[in-house]
Amino acid sequence: MSVNNHKDRPSNVPVLRRAAMDFLARREHSIYELKQKLFTKYPDSTLRDLQTALDELRRENLQSDRRFAECYVRYRKSKGFAYKHIRADLFSRGVHTDIVNDYLSSQDPDWQVMANSIIDKKIPNSNEIVYGSKQHRRLVRFLESRGFLLCEIQEAVYRNIKLIST
């Protein structure tokens, strides 16, 4: 973004606003995401014009980080991602901690249900796995990569798989 705020330069606010609305028409965006996308698309825009366009959208409730967080959490949960992963994603998209905490809780009982469901899908026919085996380690790593807490992983493995020690 150009910090060059020339007074003789025409305002770019309507163009920025229209572009932001086009992005928002496709899906909800955090304010941080919109800033990044608009900066990439219109690198010569002034900071003032960009901020003015985004402030207007927020004032008119066309952009809301709360709405974005709510939609994002629901979407990522539907794709099998859990607390730690979704939380990190929201922070990387510039969503404030208070908003993240309002829409995401590590105590949500859905996480355990999701972990159980994932194990059922990953190992549908086999209910016995050797503890510490390649298959066991792979399953634990997969659940960790999805953002499940260790206690959820252990509980899901314990409930759904008979671990055999060698």
Per-segment meaning from a language model:
Residues 1-166:
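An alpha-helical, amphipathic repeat domain used for nucleic-acid recognition
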